[in-house]
């Protein structure tokens, strides 16, 4: 009986060792890349496109042999458009999933909130469209593990102010923005700085709180101020509601939205938004992107490509280059390599500065909404720097 028990114990011990070795082998078979963004909430269209684009690109990369001889495992989580949820997700990706890097989230407030988590676990985050200055540098201090592939609010503010004053030749603007949103406040402040420096006047500056659905009071004051254009540094859902209510009040002025407004969802309110403008990182109608848009549509049952898909593409391209440069999946090595590589993305050449972790030499484009044909009309490119 004792011999039998010893034999059973020996067999169990061997199985445990084999199990541990097998688990260790599996752990090293893949490279874990995290993604976080809004799959639900007001920015769901953006987050969904980001995650679907990355899934498509990872599948393509894996089919071609992966990276460093290993397959990529993409782990995605929904932040629900909430900063605290972004923190929770970042902890899960770093502590439990042990990813080597994170792409996203798709909003400045969420990116700013996760800094402490990135610092604690020393895992780099590469943001797609978070434009607030504080994402990578705050109070003059560089954030070691925060990077981005997009232009910044000061640059977007320059593009907006320059477009209104220099291209449209308009001198009176009103502003309507979400007072609790970092992105909106940053863009608003920088637009005012550039537009007024050129000689323009902000005749009305009205605010609302995120979640509001009635903008009658603000729009009435704006109408009375007599602007020639309304600058709305907000997200597409509010952009649509504000347009509809403005038209009901007899306000037929064009509006100018930032990169948070450019979305295929706008065409659900085609008549209301017709003739207004949006700023973007890349032209949504550039023929150079036709094959990429077709690849996405074929993969996702005819779905339309959002801005975030282009930026997710560029972030993934940069991550791949950094991993290859580092020759390792060590998070700190990847963070270092982000500033040592250069790639040609959908939004142009991307080279990350070691000084501020922002891309250098960026430009932005302005496109007009053609509601009747449900498309965009390219207007111009404006240097961001």
Where are these regions (language model features)?
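Beta-alpha junction/loop-to-helix N-cap segments that form part of ligand/metal-binding clefts
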Residues: 25-27, 45-52, 64-137, 208-215, ...
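Extracytoplasmic ligand/sensor domains, especially the bilobed periplasmic-binding protein
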Residues: 99-204, 252-278
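Extracellular/periplasmic periplasmic-binding protein-like sensory domains
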Residues: 243-313, 369-370, 376-384
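Sec-exported extracytoplasmic/periplasmic mature domains
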Residues: 55, 59-66, 91-99, 115-123, ...
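Short, low-complexity disordered leader/linker segments with a strong preference
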Residues: 1-32, 63, 381-385
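Segments of small-molecule ligand-sensing domains
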Residues: 296-306, 320-376
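Extracytoplasmic "Venus flytrap"
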Residues: 34-55, 77-84, 106-107, 176-185, ...
């Amino acid at each position: 009986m004792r011999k039998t028990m010893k034999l059973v114990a020996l067999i169990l011990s061997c199985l445990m060792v084999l199990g541990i070795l097998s688990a260790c082998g599996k752990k090293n078979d893949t490279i874990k890349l995290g993604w976080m963004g809004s799959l639900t909430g007001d920015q769901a269209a953006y987050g969904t496109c980001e995650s679907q684009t990355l899934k498509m690109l990872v599948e393509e990369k894996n089919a071609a042999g992966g990276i460093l001889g290993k397959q990529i495992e993409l782990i995605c989580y929904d932040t629900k458009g909430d900063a605290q949820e972004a923190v929770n997700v970042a902890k899960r990706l770093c502590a439990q999933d042990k990813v080597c890097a994170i792409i996203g989230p798709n909003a400045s407030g969420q990116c700013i909130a996760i800094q402490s988590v990135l610092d604690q676990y020393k895992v780099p985050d590469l943001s797609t469209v978070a434009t607030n200055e504080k994402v990578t540098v705050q109070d003059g201090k560089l954030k070691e593990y925060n990077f981005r592939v997009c232009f910044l609010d000061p640059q977007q503010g320059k593009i907006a102010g320059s477009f209104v004053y220099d291209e449209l030749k308009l001198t009176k603007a009103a502003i309507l923005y979400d007072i609790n949103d970092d992105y909106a406040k940053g863009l608003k402040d920088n637009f005012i700085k550039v537009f007024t420096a050129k000689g323009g006047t902000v005749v009305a500056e009205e605010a609302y709180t995120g979640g509001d659905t009635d903008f009658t009071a603000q729009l009435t004051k704006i109408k009375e101020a007599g602007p020639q254009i309304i600058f709305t540094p907000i997200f597409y859902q509010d952009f649509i509601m504000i347009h509809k209510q403005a038209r009901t009040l007899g306000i037929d002025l064009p509006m100018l939205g930032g990169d948070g407004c450019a979305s295929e969802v706008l065409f659900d309110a085609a008549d209301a938004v017709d003739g207004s403008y949006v700023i973007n990182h890349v032209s949504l109608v550039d023929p150079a992107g036709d094959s990429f848009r077709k690849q996405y549509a074929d993969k996702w049952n005819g779905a339309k490509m959002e801005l975030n898909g282009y930026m997710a593409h560029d972030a993934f391209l940069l991550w791949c280059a950094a991993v290859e440069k580092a020759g390792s999946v060590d998070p700190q090595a990847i963070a270092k390599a982000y500033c040592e590589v250069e790639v040609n993305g959908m939004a142009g050449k991307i080279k990350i500065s070691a000084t501020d972790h922002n891309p250098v030499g960026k430009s932005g484009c302005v496109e007009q909404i053609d509601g009747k044909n449900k498309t965009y009309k390219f207007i111009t490119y404006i240097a961001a720097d």
